[in-house]
Amino acid sequence: EFDLVFIDADKVNYPTYQLIAFNMLKKGGIGVLDNMLWSGKVIDPCDKESIALRETAEIIRNDVRLSPLLLPLRDGVMIYQKMK
């Protein structure tokens, strides 16, 4: 188990990486995902990367075991703590 997991990889697979990261984190651990706003392209309804980033953000937001925060710095950074 890890205290911190940082994800900065191909955006299409972010949902899968998030699941892997969650399982690797210990309780109280921190997850960090880079490029979550994708230079503002995250709102593009047809872009594969944008769709995957929105799906990842929704997964994190809706998981009651996580306490997330989205920082709108440059490309966006999502940080969460694994609560349970």
Residue ranges: model-predicted function:
Residues 1-5:
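A short acidic, Gly/Pro-enriched loop at the edge of an enzyme's catalytic core
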Residues 13-84:
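C-terminal substrate-binding/active-site "lid" region of AdoMet-derived donor-dependent transferases
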